[in-house]
């Protein structure tokens, strides 16, 4: 899970899906509005910002506050049609002057996390506001201050009411980001059902594990297989990667950033797709090949009269149950083939790979 990809609201089958805005873009727009009001006494509404790729979105203000030595503005995040747990959250920026020569200081307010572990893009002790949003806010503040002939010595506090609860639906607690969500985004735009944010979360998890000197990490396709593997190893939270369907996101990053040992745990159907060579295991992007399963079953000793039943089976689990009913093990060969796919993808990187196949109840069917 991660802030901008965990399913929350929409249907991927809908045509012409609408893009939205990242928490970083919302924080930047809120900061621009707050700083403008701090200097002029007036809030721009709507407030426009220039994103890294040149887009110029405008944001309506949901909150305004102007007091002695501070200004505050809030924007409700619209993630478009992306299934995003931060959709509808209010991103608030409070800006006030800092001592001369201080520059721009970022602080985590209510609902924004604080980094506590090495390995992330932001050092421990700092607000979980990622580098691109920091740069966007810094540049816009420097430009506004220069326009009015003022030094850009400011404290910017970003808050998200309810953010601590939202963060429990993300990978932040396992990454060592405590107290709330992260302020994220590299382009400012949320593309519906786009995989980059989720894969970035996987990469952050590997970075944290490496920085902690962790030698063994786990990537699971879901909570059932994760629990089964954890019953064996009891790894620390930060050693559990946010893999889900993105086996390729794990393996390709480990190729360049190796960790000694990787355990991939998953249900039979998901790992059948990995065994077939698929690296994205989502049902809309890869399917179980019943012909492949028949080949596996035939090599394991299944009789010829079972071929048609396997080819006509509705699900991979039905095939598994058919073979189990006559004492044929296909989970073991699937695990071996999945391991070969993983090793091929790693391209010789020094990573030992283990595969654990589970059933729907979390029973281990194969471990190689």
UniProtKB/Swiss-Prot annotation:
Supply one GO BP term.
Answer: anaerobic cobalamin biosynthetic process
Q: List the GO molecular function terms.
A: cobalt-precorrin-5B C1-methyltransferase activity
Pfam families in the record, alphabetically?
CbiD
Write out the catalysed reaction. Answer: Co-precorrin-5B + S-adenosyl-L-methionine = Co-precorrin-6A + S-adenosyl-L-homocysteine
Q: In which pathway does it act?
A: Cofactor biosynthesis; adenosylcobalamin biosynthesis; cob(II)yrinate a,c-diamide from sirohydrochlorin (anaerobic route): step 6/10
The EC number of this protein is: 2.1.1.195
Q: Which Gene3D superfamilies match?
A: CbiD-like
Domain of life per record: Bacteria
List the InterPro entries hit by this protein, alphabetically: CbiD (IPR002748), CbiD_sf (IPR036074)
* Phosphoprotein listed as a keyword: no
Q: Does the keyword Transferase apply?
A: yes
* This protein's UniProt keywords: Cobalamin biosynthesis, Methyltransferase, S-adenosyl-L-methionine, Transferase
The similarity comment for this entry is: Belongs to the CbiD family.
Tell me which NCBIfam families the record gives. cbiD (TIGR00312), PRK00075.1-1 (NF000849)
Its protein name is: Cobalt-precorrin-5B C(1)-methyltransferase
Q: Which gene encodes it?
A: cbiD
